[in-house]
A protein has these predicted regions:
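Catalytic Tyr-X3-Lys loop
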Residues: 1-2, 42
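Active-site loop immediately N-terminal to the catalytic Tyr-X3-Lys motif
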Residues: 29-33
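C-terminal helical subdomain
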Residues: 60-63, 68, 76-128
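Glycine-centered, small-residue-biased loops immediately flanking beta-strands
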Residues: 15
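Active-site-adjacent segment of SDR/Rossmann-fold oxidoreductases
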Residues: 10, 27, 48-57
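Active-site helix of classical SDR
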Residues: 4, 38
Length: 128
């Protein structure tokens, strides 16, 4: 947040800010209180900044369930430590996780768009 505030005041010209949000900002996930709360804060911060700076493109994107090292760490935990682990293992085994490259391509597509997009959006809605 401090870095983005500095960016808004110190950098001249056209500006765009994209924050990494999460669906976890909208759902209470047992064992993830800090993660859910921090992602909810990211969503609200982006929403408030967008109101304060309507001339700028400010967004928080939800990348979806992405096959990252974080996902591997989640799957390696026990049900005792994270009751929802079975769901994440199932998502991985079914092949339904999104590749990081897919998210990056979708985000680049959004950045290049000149039309209106919601402040909070899912990259799965903007595939190439």
């Amino acid at each position: 947040m401090l870095l983005s505030a500095k960016f808004l005041t110190e950098i001249a010209g056209e500006k765009q800010l994209y924050f990494t949000g999460s669906g976890a900002a909208e759902f209470a996930i047992e064992g993830w209180s800090a993660y859910c709360a921090s992602k909810a804060a990211v969503h609200m911060y982006a929403s408030v900044l967008a109101k304060e700076h309507p001339d700028l493109r400010i967004h928080a994107f939800r990348p979806g369930k992405v096959n990252t090292p974080m996902q591997a760490e989640i799957r390696a935990t026990t049900a005792e430590n994270f009751p929802g682990v079975a769901h994440f293992v199932e998502e991985f085994e079914s092949g339904s996780l999104v590749l990081p490259e897919t998210v990056a391509t979708s985000l680049l597509h959004v950045i290049d768009r000149k039309d209106e997009i919601p402040v909070i959006f899912s990259t799965s809605n903007y595939t190439v």
